[in-house]
UniProtKB/Swiss-Prot annotation:
The lineage of its organism: Eukaryota, Fungi, Dikarya, Ascomycota, Taphrinomycotina. Its main location: cytoplasm. It comes from Schizosaccharomyces pombe (strain 972 / ATCC 24843) (Fission yeast). Signal peptide: none annotated. This is Vacuolar protein sorting-associated protein 45. Pfam families: Sec1 (PF00995).
Length: 558
C-alpha cells in the first residue's frame, strides 16, 4: 500500500495511452492532485506540451490531442459540456478521479456534437498524496451548525475521497468507527452503501485477512494538533505551513523582506526523505554533514581538473552538482529560519511546559508556568495553544483557573473573538465529549509508573508525547480494540473478523490528521512486519489551522 506508487502508475498509464504531443486539461482540484504527484519535468518527458485550466479562455490548437484529468463534479460537468460544444483540440481523452454517475455521461454525450471525445475512464485518485502513506482530502472545515452535523459539501467530498482511496489501493474493507462520533457513523454508513452499490468496482480478490477502514474523530484527541512540533516535516508545517509540498517563509537573517518559496517533496529530495522525521537536534548534525559533503565534492572536482577531458567531465557533472548545491542551500536556509523562530518564540521553554502539562501528573506549578509565558513576548497563537492545553487538562480539576486564563489572554491583548476558541474547544472536545483519555490517569499506580519513567529518563524531553492514535492502532493490531469504543458497522463482518489481527489498515481522521501522527504511522510501517497502514485526513493540521477551525465552529455552532 504505497500512495506514491499508486498515483504514479495511474499517470504513467494515462500518458502512455495517449501518444504524441498533448495538452493536459485540469481544474482547480486536480491541479493540486497532479502537482502532489508529478513534477513539471515529468510532464515534459511525457510529451505534455501545455497544461491548461478548464473554464479559462484558451486559443484553439486543433492539431493537438487533449488529456483531461478532472473531478466528476457539477461545476466540471457544466464547463466540460461548454468545452465540447466548441472543442479547442483534435480529440479529448477524459479521465475522472472518481466514480462517474450515469447522468454525467448522458450530459456529456448530448454535448459532444463534434464527437471529439475518444475515451472516458475512471482513474481513482481523488486525494492529495502527501507521503507514501499519508493522504489529504484538503477540506479545512467540516462542521455545519453543531459538532455532530456535517457540512453537505465537506461530507460529500470526504466520502468521495475515501471511495477513491479504497479503489486506488484495491481494498474492500471492514469498517470500524469512533462510537461517540455521529460524524464518523454517518460517513461509515455512506461508504458502506457505496461499496455495496458499486459491487463490481469493489470485486477484488478476497484476502486472508480483511482490511480495516478505521474512521476516527479529531475531537477524541485535541492535544496533538496543539503541541509544538520537534521533527523536521512537522516543524516546517507548524511554523510556516506546507501547502501541497510548497513552503513560504521570510528570511529573517536577510535584509530582503520578500518571502522565499521552496518545494519539499520526499519523492524528489533524498535528503528531505531521509530527515523529515528526525528531531531538531539530530537535524542540525545531518545538515552539517550535508554541507560538508558538498564542500568535499566541490574541492575534489576543482582539484581534479588538469586536462580538457577533465574539464569536459566536470561540466557534464556540473548540473548534478548545481542541483545538489541548490538543495543544500534550500535546507540550510529553512533550518536557519526554524532556529530563528524557535529562539524568537521561546519554543524550547514553551515545548518543555507543554510536554510536562500533557504527559505528566497535574502539578500546582503548571498554572504559574502558563501564566508566566502568557505575559512574555511570544505570539498570540502560542499563547492560545498554551491556554487551550491547560484548559483541556484542568477543565474538571480547576475550572476557576481555566476561566482566569481566558481573562488573562484578553488582558494581554489577545482578541476576545480568538479567546472564544477555548470554551468552543471544551464544548467540542472537552472531557465529556471524548472517549478514552488522552491524558495519563491520576491514580497511585500511574504516579508510581511516572516515577519509574523519571528514573529511567526519556530520550528527549520535547518528544515525550504520543498521539492517541498510537494506542488505538496498537490495540487494533493486537486484537484488543474494544467494540464498545470502536464498533464494527456490520454485525456480520464483526463475527467473521473480530478475532483476526488485521494486516492492512486505512485510518481516516475526520477533522484532520497531523504530521506527528503521520510520523508514528511511518515508523510503525517500518518496524512492524506484516502490517501496512495508510493515514488520511480531511486536512493536514497544524496548530494555526486547528485553532482557525475551532474559531470557525464558534461562529456556526448554535
Amino acid at each position: 500500500m504505497d500512495l506514491v506508487s499508486a498515483s504514479q502508475s495511474y499517470f504513467k498509464r494515462i500518458f502512455q495511452e495517449v501518444s504524441d504531443l498533448k495538452i493536459l486539461l485540469l481544474e482547480e482540484d486536480t491541479t493540486k492532485i497532479v502537482s502532489s504527484c508529478i513534477t513539471q519535468s515529468n510532464l515534459l518527458e511525457q510529451q505534455i506540451y501545455l497544461t491548461v485550466l478548464l473554464g479559462n479562455k484558451r486559443e484553439k490548437l486543433r492539431h493537438l490531442k487533449c488529456v483531461a484529468f478532472l473531478r466528476p463534479t457539477p461545476t466540471t460537468l457544466r464547463l466540460l459540456c461548454e468545452e465540447l460544444r466548441d472543442p479547442k483540440y483534435a480529440e479529448y481523452h477524459l479521465y475522472f478521479t472518481n466514480v462517474i454517475p450515469k447522468s454525467f455521461l448522458e450530459r456529456l454525450a448530448e454535448s459532444d456534437d463534434f464527437e471529439a471525445v475518444k475515451s472516458i475512464q475512471e482513474f481513482f485518485l481523488d486525494y492529495l498524496v502527501v507521503n507514501n502513506d499519508l493522504a489529504s482530502f484538503n477540506i479545512p472545515h467540516i462542521i455545519e451548525d453543531s459538532p455532530d452535523n456535517w457540512q453537505d459539501g465537506a461530507f460529500h467530498r470526504t466520502h468521495q475521497g475515501i471511495i477513491s482511496l479504497l479503489l486506488s489501493l484495491k481494498k474492500k474493507p471492514v469498517i470500524r468507527y469512533d462510537n461517540n462520533s455521529l460524524l464518523c457513523l454517518k460517513l461509515a454508513e455512506e461508504v458502506s452503501y457505496t461499496i455495496q452499490h458499486e459491487s463490481q468496482l469493489f470485486n477484488f480478490r478476497k484476502p486472508d485477512t480483511a482490511p480495516i477502514l478505521l474512521l476516527l474523530d479529531r475531537k477524541n484527541d485535541p492535544i496533538t494538533p496543539l503541541l509544538t512540533q520537534w521533527t523536521y516535516q512537522a516543524m516546517v508545517h507548524e511554523l510556516f505551513g506546507i501547502d501541497n509540498g510548497r513552503v513560504s517563509f521570510s528570511n529573517s537573517t536577510s535584509d530582503n523582506e520578500k518571502s522565499t518559496e521552496i518545494v519539499l517533496n520526499p519523492t524528489l529530495d533524498p535528503f528531505y526523505k531521509e530527515t523529515r522525521f528526525d528531531n531538531f537536534g539530530d537535524l542540525g548534525v545531518k545538515i552539517k554533514d550535508y554541507v560538508s559533503h558538498l564542500q568535499t565534492k566541490s574541492t575534489k572536482k576543482a582539484s581534479e581538473i588538469e586536462s580538457i577531458a577533465d574539464m569536459k567531465q566536470f561540466l557534464e557533472a556540473y548540473p548534478e552538482y548545481r542541483r545538489l548545491s541548490g538543495n543544500v542551500s534550500k535546507h540550510v536556509s529553512l533550518v536557519s529560519e526554524i532556529s530563528q523562530v524557535v529562539q524568537r518564540e521561546n519554543l524550547l521553554e514553551v515545548g518543555e511546559v507543554e510536554q510536562s502539562l500533557v504527559c505528566n501528573e497535574p502539578q500546582s506549578t503548571d498554572f504559574n508556568d502558563i501564566q508566566r509565558l502568557l505575559f512574555s513576548n511570544i505570539s498570540e497563537n502560542t499563547k492560545l495553544r498554551l491556554a487551550a492545553l491547560y484548559s483541556l487538562r484542568f477543565e474538571r480539576i480547576d475550572p476557576a483557573k481555566v476561566s482566569a486564563l481566558q481573562q488573562m489572554l484578553i488582558a494581554g491583548g489577545v482578541n476576545p473573538l480568538k479567546v472564544s476558541v477555548i470554551p468552543t474547544l471544551l464544548h467540542v472536545a472537552g472531557y465529556s465529549f471524548r472517549q478514552g483519555d488522552v491524558f495519563p490517569p491520576s491514580n497511585l499506580f500511574s504516579r508510581a509508573r511516572s516515577g519509574l519513567k523519571g528514573l529511567r529518563g526519556v530520550e528527549n524531553v520535547y518528544i515525550q508525547h504520543n498521539p492517541f492514535l498510537k494506542s488505538i492502532l496498537l490495540d487494533l493490531i493486537q486484537g484488543r480494540l474494544k467494540e464498545t469504543t470502536h464498533p464494527f458497522l456490520n454485525s456480520e463482518t464483526r463475527a467473521q473478523t473480530s478475532n483476526e489481527k488485521p494486516q492492512d489498515i486505512i485510518v481516516v481522521i475526520v477533522g484532520g490528521a497531523t504530521y506527528e501522527e503521520a510520523h508514528f504511522v511511518s515508523e510503525f510501517n517500518a518496524t512492524q512486519p506484516g502490517v501496512r497502514i495508510i493515514l488520511a485526513g480531511t486536512t493536514i493540521l497544524n496548530s494555526t489551522a486547528y485553532i482557525d477551525d475551532i474559531m470557525y465552529m464558534s461562529t456556526r455552532i448554535k
